[in-house]
Amino acid sequence: MTIYTGSGVAIVTPFFEDGSVDYNTFGELIEFQIAEGTDAIIVAGTTGESSTMPDDEQVAVIDFAIKKVAGRIPVIAGSGVNDTAHSIRLSKEIEKLGPDALLVVTPYYIKTSQQGLIEHFEAIANSVDLPIVLYNVPGRTGQVMAPETILHLSQHKNIVAYKDAVGDIAHTLAVRNLVGDKI
């Protein structure tokens, strides 16, 4: 089983009108994706509403997904938030649940330098023993991780993949040309 090939679905987190998670529907969505052949489930990313959930709810959603998937396909769990210390705490808590990897977004709202991004991601990567997928989504975070930053981070043993939601083919090609198959 690998998280690095095929189709990984960023799954939605369904809610009831009162704001509570609809776990029955969530379970049905997971089963549908597995039955239709998806290769991995990404839980509590942007599509999964992670930025709107308190930590305990996010952890519960991830825990439910891991148990529902039951090892049939990889589960990549969103654990990045807008500050480093919080991201580390959340990543460590989620690591205990047993996901196959963590999806860590660039900090949102707080714009930092590329060196600040390096320090942020390295601190998180140093705090866990799980593969980390870098998530570059400037439309949601307000900042772009530069190709050179991604290259630098690709040298870390725990940083193994990159999710590109930049929406600029020139940037994507620059990352590919610079980083190659390192992630």
Predicted regions and their residues:
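Catalytic alpha/beta core domains of metabolic enzymes, predominantly
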Residues: 126-127, 140-183
